[in-house]
């Protein structure tokens, strides 16, 4: 196992905001063969989650080779094996690995994704990706725009407003808003009940809790939250208080950005507004295709699985991927079990 960072769980340790907790209940966020401590809270704070991962590594004696960057992996047809070239980042010494099996577990979050917007490079204020955002404490009194309405974007907007920033958020696409209690119920019920029935329940209850949000710029997708997650990997937003601040006008909602000039952002319908800073909560992208050769049996041009979940994890010639299906920790655990069982069944010394 090679890892380019100097620690495990570098995203959680170094590239997450201070108030982050797991958005799903702990029973849906466990890795194989190890539960959380019995006294752990239902929704795990990030520091406790990192501790869980540290304990997992220690318990199963996992020994990653840190600060080792993969440069290329290719399949040798003649030798029927994978050849991987890596480099130790501390010494620049090259290392070669030969293996019968290769597991791509570099994640969906390998690189920040910031969309191309006309004029962005000339923006007069600070522009950061959500991976660099820590707290709204330094933004008090500033006009801040959050781009992206997933869980990170909505929670960052709430954090900014709570610290006194004049906060706006760009909501470009339909999105489901639910409570953490509702999504926990839904994920429990769907194990025994058809997904369309559970989705109907979730939508009805969410409408009861939040009311009609379309007048505030938030429109629900046509597909239900669980089916949408299963089909596209897009998660429902679990409200932490953002909706209330949108309703009372504390957080302003805008549509798509047309262009930026100086510190002025022009939105669709020619609406313009000045901002001091912009936070892009626009997700991440896979970089697997930059180093994986002969992976076309498994990954598309974006470095994500070609096949739909749950048949996405296996390619040709002993190639596998884990954690690329946009299914969170539960999906990672499923991938790990499927891959381990498949390797075990096909391994003949």
Q: At which residue positions do the language-model features occur?
A:
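Redox-cofactor-proximal catalytic regions of oxidoreductases
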Residues: 7-35, 56-59, 63
């Amino acid at each position: 196992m090679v890892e380019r960072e100097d620690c495990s769980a570098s995203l959680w340790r170094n590239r997450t905001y201070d108030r982050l907790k797991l958005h799903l209940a702990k029973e849906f966020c466990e890795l194989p063969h190890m539960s959380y401590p019995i006294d752990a809270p239902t929704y795990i704070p990030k520091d406790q989650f990192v501790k869980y991962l540290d304990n997992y590594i220690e318990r199963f004696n996992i020994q990653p080779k840190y600060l080792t960057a993969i440069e290329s992996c290719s399949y040798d047809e003649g030798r029927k094996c994978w050849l991987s070239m890596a480099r130790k980042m501390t010494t620049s010494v090259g290392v070669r690995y030969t293996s019968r099996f290769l597991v791509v577990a570099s994640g969906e979050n390998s690189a920040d994704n910031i969309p191309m917007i006309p004029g962005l490079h000339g923006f007069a204020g600070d522009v950061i990706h959500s991976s660099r955002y820590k707290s709204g404490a330094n933004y008090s009194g500033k006009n801040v725009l959050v781009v992206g309405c997933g869980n990170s974007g909505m929670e960052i907007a709430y954090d900014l407003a709570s610290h006194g920033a004049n906060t706006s958020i760009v909501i470009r696409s339909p999105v489901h808003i639910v409570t953490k209690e509702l999504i926990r119920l839904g994920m429990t019920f769907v194990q025994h009940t058809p997904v369309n029935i559970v989705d109907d329940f979730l939508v009805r209850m969410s409408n009861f809790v939040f009311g009609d949000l379309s007048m505030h710029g938030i429109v629900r997708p046509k597909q239900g939250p669980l089916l949408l997650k299963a089909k596209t990997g897009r998660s429902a937003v679990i409200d932490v208080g953002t909706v209330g601040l949108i309703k009372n006008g504390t957080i302003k909602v805008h549509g798509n950005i047309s262009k930026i000039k100086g510190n002025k952002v022009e939105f669709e319908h020619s609406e313009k507004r000045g901002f001091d800073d912009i936070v892009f909560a626009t997700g991440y992208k896979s970089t697997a295709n930059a180093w994986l050769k002969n992976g076309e049996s498994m990954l598309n041009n974006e470095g994500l699985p070609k096949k739909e979940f749950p048949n996405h994890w296996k390619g040709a010639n002993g190639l596998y991927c884990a954690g690329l299906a946009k299914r969170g920790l539960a999906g990672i655990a499923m991938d790990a079990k499927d891959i381990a069982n498949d390797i075990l069944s096909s391994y003949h010394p």
